[in-house]
Amino acid sequence: MDYLDLGPYSSASGTVRLPGSKSISNRVLLLAALAEGETTITNLLDSDDTRVMLDALGKLGVKLARDGDTCVVTGTRGAFTAKTADLFLGNAGTAVRPLTAALAVNGGDYRVHGVPRMHERPIGDLVDGLRQIGAQIDYELSEGYPPLRIKPATISVDAPIRVRGDVSSQFLTALLMTLPLVKAKDGQAVVEVDGELISKPYVDITIRLMARFGVTVERDGWQRFVVPAGVRYRSPGRIMVEGDASSASYFLAAGALGGGPLRVEGVGRASIQGDVGFANALMQMGANVTMGDDWIDVRGIGHDHGKLEPIDMDFNLIPDAAMTIAVAALFANGTSTLRNIASWRVKETDRIAAMATELRKVGAIVEEGPDYLVVTPPEKLTPNAAIDTYDDHRMAMCFSLVSLGGVPVRINDPKCVGKTFPDYFDRFAALAKA
């Protein structure tokens, strides 16, 4: 097995410019593909998840011209030209869910599949929502999970569409992005969310990006959404992808644990991503954080004892960045509790189980619940722990931070970071110092 040995490091400082946001990159690619006109996307993330989206769009007949982190997309005016396609989407939830919805109303014959873990990640709530408007979608193996067969169908929106919100916000995102393409009574489609909507900031990203492409979604709280139906997305001409706020969390934590000063460029106060809220959680733990419109600075910890304060917080809004808090909790002077993180169970791996297992390897006492994690740090971190990453990019990036505790750590299968941040470890090594 491939592995990477890190540390021991005693400090971290410098400046890092973030790669483009995965969540924004894949949404913008699909919106540009469905729009009228040509869109130039800059700072597009180059990673496994964006590559599978680009490959799929190419197979669907979308004209794409890439040059570095810029991509020019010629829109299809609301309908993909390819009416049959076999689409492999890896383990990219940000690709498989919105594309499934767009394909369901495209009047073609499609197969959607991915890696084995993708076939364990739920999609049933989205399929149920699409079937309410007439979509013809069959499960190939297990009910509620990919692979999917999508067939031509007569689509009509005659009543509010109901969708569960408590498993993944991507089901709602997929419906919102697709409904402008279909005709509806009174020219509008209504989506009603059953249960508590998780990861609300990600839905906010969707709505803001749809507005950039000329479609305004109205919402009543987070339970009812009204979407103009039978309208065209229109290209904004140029759109820049802001830096990935989830990826920022590792460097911000490094600036706290390693003393800083460490500046992250590409996200800040003006960001549309909820994961910039990670900076507030870090401040609650005692880190010295300052923020500009598109940068965040961290300069160590503001306590004489040099340890973070423990945290007890609901992370429903920022589940991805919460993983970084779980590892930062190793450096706190007490027990931390991460609440409302049930969505971790259906991500790239069962992240609650994986995080508990790996935190114990470095000496933590961990209590794992259905939707929470309680982390008590050890007196001293266990050196030379071999961290398994479960083919999960965020596990690999989070646990790099252990090396800032003055102990060496081994990261197994480090290449899994290719999903969102292929050169993460090079960037981390440039900031960390022995």
Swiss-Prot record:
Localization in the cell: Cytoplasm
UniProt-recorded name of the protein: 3-phosphoshikimate 1-carboxyvinyltransferase
Any single biological process term in GO: aromatic amino acid family biosynthetic process
Residues engaged in binding 3-phosphoshikimate: 22-23, 27, 168-170, 199, 320, 347
Sequence similarity: Belongs to the EPSP synthase family.
Pathway field: Metabolic intermediate biosynthesis; chorismate biosynthesis; chorismate from D-erythrose 4-phosphate and phosphoenolpyruvate: step 6/7
Cytoplasm in keyword set: yes
Keywords for the protein's UniProt record, in alphabetical order: Amino-acid biosynthesis, Aromatic amino acid biosynthesis, Cytoplasm, Transferase
Keyword Transferase assigned: yes
Molecular-function annotations in GO: 3-phosphoshikimate 1-carboxyvinyltransferase activity
Catalytic residues (positions): 320 (proton acceptor)
EC number: 2.5.1.19
Gene3D superfamilies assigned to the protein according to its UniProt record, in alphabetical order: Enolpyruvate transferase domain
Residues annotated as binding phosphoenolpyruvate: 22, 93, 121, 170, 351, 394, 419
Gene name, Swiss-Prot/TrEMBL: aroA
Catalytic activity reported: 3-phosphoshikimate + phosphoenolpyruvate = 5-O-(1-carboxyvinyl)-3-phosphoshikimate + phosphate
